[in-house]
């Protein structure tokens, strides 16, 4: 198994690429230093910051007993093992920290990066335990089941016949803006599971995958249970803990944060705007747009509704139109914190206040919007944890490795390496495709054949005076032979050109297939393709293989893996 590391700054995806914030965050130099100074609290490259964070978390008070109880209850419901219960128990100690990551539940686990996030949290926690053996570090996967973007969660994709096959079950008894975690599946889900399984190629692992998904995504189950049971099964041998924030006990722990937001809004939004202005002055584009109130109201139908600040002390729920004074909504929050849900601005604050978070494993987009939140962390009286880029892979199947071999033979210069071919593919695929149009056909074909015909005519003409002296009747025979010889050369030229065009077409077709494999529909493979495509073909041991690769490499570079 070959691996190659690519600098994120050298990757240009056909569609959505990586933000400038993320590219600078994972690079070296002045831009990174400036970004960290202005937008983050800790630097993972500074040894002193690790001791600072350990001391800081050790001095804070957390509701550890409550956390342990609710995590045990949740994870037992998801089918955890004794390994996971022992891991949860560690959190009772003030010398136990959390390495957190998370994602909204995706259909059948969702795209590959969900698996990569979980593995990155596990590996980083193990690495910290090796560095600080007197502490424990527990990897926690925060399931963002309060998200209400059904279209994003209820979709997944597989490679099929050189194309991308999409799967989207129809919503079952779902209301607009309803939280996805509690959305249940109807009988239609049986068909979606069957179509998904049928699309997977036959393999020794297909039957087990079918059994897992049919059980986890049975009619009547929910996105939360389906996702959690699937995750727990795949990571049954890994110390990964799952967390659902849609839990009454967890909401009680969140109550003070919700109350501070309601009591001080729109201060948090002004903080994000001020931090965003700093980023824009540094030349970056920001993506997180705060609201005056960074909370949603959850009604009795589990719909997430906007809370609008109409006047200084008047709040209104949309679209239901209930109105509350600031005092009334604070009382409501005190009595019923389960009716509130943080948006993207407030969610990290909730996470890093309730959990003793040593580090957060984040994707490129998350790192970009976390850069906007430093002032908000300070507003809520906490320090940002280490922000660690998640592991990022492109998995290369053998047939595409062979295409890379062919490209290396045809386009490579002396000393050209496989890594340089991948660099060319990931850095400027369109230019590579344009260049390939002329690769197979020799650029000097026309000149060489013209020179050959001219030389042949000259040689044949030089025979004429010699033949005339020997026998004048040979002159017409020579003329006919000259015509025939030129026709043979022209025929050879046409066949050469035809062979070149065919070779071009084959090469371009192979490059096109590689583009679909590496950038399906123009986006990175890890953002589109479901994990089970590769688990089905290469077995569940692939998870351990990728974990080992992450253990040996920095997550600040993209990893190409030839399977």
From Swiss-Prot:
One Pfam family per UniProt: Rossmann-like_BshC
Keywords recorded for this protein, A-Z: Coiled coil, Ligase
Gene: bshC
InterPro entries xrefs: Bacillithiol_biosynth_BshC, CC_BshC, Rossmann-like_BshC
Annotated GO MF terms: ligase activity
Enzyme class: ligase
Keyword set includes Lipid biosynthesis: no
Coiled coil segments of this chain: 444-464, 493-517
E.C. designation(s): 6.-.-.-
Family: Belongs to the BshC family.
Protein name: Putative cysteine ligase BshC
